[in-house]
């Protein structure tokens, strides 16, 4: 069993990429449903606030994302979204029977801008949470950022540069994002170590086309 937690930016700066984000996410889900093994899916969409549209649903029961779910507005309360999701999933794992805790848990965070609206969590709090989850429970975190220095921003969260990547925030870049995310998820679900070149295709796209 693998637990997948998607934390996706839908702030106003994502305007114009709604259909690309929805299509990329749904394509990724469709591919994952064809893979062997069980998985639970949580999806958090954030702007000024966070909206949980899937809360630990079995993968095969996750409905496609629609424009009623993903619409852009507001600012970027990234820390609140990440902190809230870790707190929620962490508490469930803490109080679950050992046999009910997924073997692997993976958080995938995408944003096209810096934090600017959180009220409940700050960087230090979230960094401590992430470092604790990685060290004690082996959780995996990926950070995909556009229009920012993704490695530098991820480091403030306690996420290493090897798990962070800058992407091109346009139609092609968004589609590639979800292809690469799907490949990374496949590796984790198959209990294979996530290789250092998981982000190679995104890096090459940015080198070719720029940020």
Kindly label every feature range from the protein language model.
Residues 1-211:
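Acidic, low-complexity intrinsically disordered regions
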């Amino acid at each position: 069993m693998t637990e997948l937690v998607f934390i996706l930016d839908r702030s106003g700066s994502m305007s114009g990429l709604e259909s690309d984000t929805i299509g990329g996410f749904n394509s990724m889900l469709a591919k994952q449903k064809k893979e062997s093994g069980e998985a639970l899916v949580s999806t958090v969409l954030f702007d000024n606030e966070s909206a949980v549209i899937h809360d630990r649903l079995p993968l095969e029961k996750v409905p496609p994302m629609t424009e009623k779910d993903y619409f852009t507005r507001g600012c970027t309360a990234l820390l609140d979204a990440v902190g809230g999701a870790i707190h929620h999933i962490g508490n469930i794992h803490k109080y679950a029977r050992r046999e009910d805790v997924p073997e692997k848990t993976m958080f995938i965070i995408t944003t096209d801008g810096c934090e600017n609206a959180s009220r409940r969590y700050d960087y230090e709090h979230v960094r401590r949470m992430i470092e604790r989850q990685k060290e004690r429970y082996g959780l995996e975190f990926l950070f995909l950022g556009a229009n920012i220095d993704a490695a530098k921003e991820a480091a403030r969260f306690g996420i290493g540069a090897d798990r962070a990547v800058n992407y091109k925030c346009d139609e092609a870049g968004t589609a590639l994002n979800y292809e690469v995310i799907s490949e990374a998820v496949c590796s984790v679900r198959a209990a294979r170590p996530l290789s250092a070149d998981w982000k190679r295709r995104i890096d090459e796209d940015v080198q070719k086309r720029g940020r």
